[in-house]
């Protein structure tokens, strides 16, 4: 990937442009682990399928996202990037995108809520034809505050489980009037990004924030979807005793048959040394649970928004708050017991660490890139609704990834193809 050093002619709001050189090196390092996206970028640069298309992307501003942004620009898009989380921005990456690639970026690590919302408005002022969203904040804000822009939107792509839940609610309410691609539901996304990416990066963030030993700890994982499965798998591999809380009986059975303890949060609250929420819902850990926790219990979140842990209630129960390490805040409750909160209750893997490894984001962002291309190719043909990534694109990404990994697999023989398409062969 070649950086284009030209006079800066784009709008931006980043921490420090002098960080660009460091960001450039890290973006190029991540690119080594993203061979699928590299191949798409090469094709895009020749075919220019997104020429002139205005894209507003609301994503975590990381080295992996930078490679997606560069691929979109190579495809001819007029892309603008804002952060999807106040704590997830990597300031050097933001600087490099502006300086080296001429991409407008509005993202500051640690930005307050007012700044974040202002950046969402900047994304809408771009008058996007395509919205790449991570939690559906841009889409939701447009529907509520800028309905004048809706007619110009070709479609949106959504990266997260949380965002797809919001899109489904919008569709049910009759306010989603354009097509949305459920990138999260692609097999090459959630099987790998959600499970292996979240599992590894969540524990990475916890360890960076606390430097605790996980072996022998009782870790309570709230939620056993793909993200929860990944967190539980890696925690168990580090020697922790894992307890799962769930509301879905099928997932609870899965956890039990995976050899994990399953119980309500009301029972787990007094057992856990470390609590990790990965549900996508609000107040999974709340007032009554804090009251039951051990002294020094650690709580953190790896779901999308900072609402899974009821920090307002914890603040009301506390007589004192103090930062004891970066991203590590101690709440002292009335009576002297303490509860430790990591990363302000935001995504701990991005607040205290670097997010998912580039290798899994390679497939996730290949899905994003192909989803955008699919929306453009099918402009005017898709009714309002939520669409899965076409199976042929999902399989194409998987095949490219396997080839990059040097792995070959079998193909069906003519006899096998005939058998699975017939009904008259059975017991011989």
Swiss-Prot record:
This protein's UniProt keywords: Cytoplasm, Hydrolase, NAD, One-carbon metabolism
Q: Which reaction does it catalyse?
A: S-adenosyl-L-homocysteine + H2O = L-homocysteine + adenosine
Q: Does the keyword NAD apply?
A: yes
**So where does substrate get bound?**
62, 134, 159, 189, 193
- Locate the residues binding NAD(+): 160-162, 194, 223-228, 246, 281, 302-304, 349
Query: What GO terms describe the biological role, i.e. biological process, of this protein?
Result: L-homocysteine biosynthetic process; one-carbon metabolic process; S-adenosylmethionine cycle
* Names of required cofactors: NAD(+)
- This protein's source sits in the domain of life called Bacteria
Which InterPro entries does the UniProt record give? Adenosylhomocyst_ase-like_sf, Adenosylhomocysteinase-like, Ado_hCys_hydrolase_NAD-bd, NAD(P)-bd_dom_sf, S-Ado-L-homoCys_hydrolase_CS
UniProt-listed Enzyme Commission number(s): 3.13.2.1
**Localization terms from the record:** Cytoplasm
EC top class named in words:
hydrolase
Q: In which pathway does it act?
A: Amino-acid biosynthesis; L-homocysteine biosynthesis; L-homocysteine from S-adenosyl-L-homocysteine: step 1/1
A GO molecular function assigned to this protein is: adenosylhomocysteinase activity
Q: Which Pfam families match?
A: AdoHcyase, AdoHcyase_NAD
Task: Spell out the family assignment given in the record's similarity comment.
Answer: Belongs to the adenosylhomocysteinase family.
PANTHER family noted in UniProt: ADENOSYLHOMOCYSTEINASE
Spell out the protein name for this chain: Adenosylhomocysteinase
């Amino acid at each position: 990937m070649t950086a284009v050093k030209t006079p800066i002619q784009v709008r931006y709001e980043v921490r420090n442009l002098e960080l660009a050189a460091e960001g450039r090196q890290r973006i190029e390092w991540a690119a080594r682990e993203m061979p699928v996206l590299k191949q798409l970028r090469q094709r895009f640069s020749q075919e220019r399928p997104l020429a002139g298309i205005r894209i507003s992307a609301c994503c975590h501003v990381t080295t992996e996202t930078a490679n997606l942004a560069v691929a979109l620009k190579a495809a001819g898009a007029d892309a603008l990037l804002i952060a999807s989380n106040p704590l997830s921005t990597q300031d050097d990456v933001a600087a490099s995108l502006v300086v080296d690639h001429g991409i407008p970026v509005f993202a500051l690590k640690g930005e307050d809520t007012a700044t974040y919302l202002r950046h969402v408005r900047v994304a809408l002022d771009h008058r996007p034809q395509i919205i790449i969203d991570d939690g559906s904040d841009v889409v939701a804000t447009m529907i509520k505050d800028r309905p004048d822009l809706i007619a110009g939107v070709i479609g949106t792509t959504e990266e997260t489980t949380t965002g797809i839940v919001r899109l489904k609610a919008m569709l049910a309410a009759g306010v989603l009037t354009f097509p949305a691609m459920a990138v999260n539901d692609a097999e090459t996304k959630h099987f790998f990004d959600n499970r292996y990416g979240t599992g590894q990066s969540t524990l990475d963030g916890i360890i960076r924030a606390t430097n605790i030993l996980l072996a022998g700890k009782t870790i309570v994982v709230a939620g056993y979807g793909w993200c929860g499965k990944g967190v539980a798998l890696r925690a168990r591999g580090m020697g922790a005793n894992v307890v799962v809380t769930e509301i879905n009986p099928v997932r609870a059975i899965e956890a039990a048959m995976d050899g994990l303890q399953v119980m309500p949060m009301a029972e787990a609250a007094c057992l856990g040394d470390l609590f990790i929420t990965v549900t996508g819902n609000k107040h999974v850990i709340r007032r009554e649970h804090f009251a039951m926790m051990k002294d020094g219990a650690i709580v953190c979140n790896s779901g999308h928004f900072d609402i899974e842990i009821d920090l307002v209630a914890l603040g009301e129960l506390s007589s004192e708050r103090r930062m004891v390490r970066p991203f590590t805040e101690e709440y002292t409750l009335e009576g002297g017991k303490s509860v430790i909160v990591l990363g302000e209750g935001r995504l701990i893997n991005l607040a205290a660490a670097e997010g998912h490894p580039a290798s899994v984001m390679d497939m996730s962002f290949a899905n994003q890139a192909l989803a955008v291309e699919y929306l453009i190719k099918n402009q005017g043909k898709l009714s309002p609704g939520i669409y899965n990534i076409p199976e042929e694109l999902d399989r194409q990404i998987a095949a490219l990834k396997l080839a990059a990994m040097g792995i070959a697999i079998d193909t069906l023989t003519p006899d096998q193809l005939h058998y699975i398409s017939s009904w008259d062969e059975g017991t011989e």
